[in-house]
């Protein structure tokens, strides 16, 4: 999982990527290609 300062590029990397908020952090999850998982500080 990458830690990024901006998730704008991360959510457009793959069409299955979704932005979710968990425990006060912003995550990008991608079910079909988990390589693209990311979180924001």
UniProtKB/Swiss-Prot annotation:
InterPro entries named among the record's database cross-references = Ribosomal_bL36, Ribosomal_bL36_sp, Ribosomal_L36_bact
Q: Which PROSITE patterns match?
A: RIBOSOMAL_L36
Q: Name one GO biological process term.
A: translation
Keywords attached to this Swiss-Prot or TrEMBL record, sorted alphabetically, are: Ribonucleoprotein, Ribosomal protein
Which is one Pfam family of this protein?
A: Ribosomal_L36
Q: Name one GO cellular component term.
A: ribosome
Coiled-coil-forming residues are none
GO terms for MF: structural constituent of ribosome
Give the superkingdom in one word.
Bacteria
Q: Output the PANTHER family linked to this UniProt entry.
A: 50S RIBOSOMAL PROTEIN L36 2 (PTHR47781), LARGE RIBOSOMAL SUBUNIT PROTEIN BL36B (PTHR47781:SF1)
Can you tell me which family this protein belongs to?
Belongs to the bacterial ribosomal protein bL36 family.
User: What's the name of the protein?
Assistant: Large ribosomal subunit protein bL36
Query: What organism, scientifically named, is this protein from?
Result: Xanthomonas campestris pv. campestris (strain ATCC 33913 / DSM 3586 / NCPPB 528 / LMG 568 / P 25)
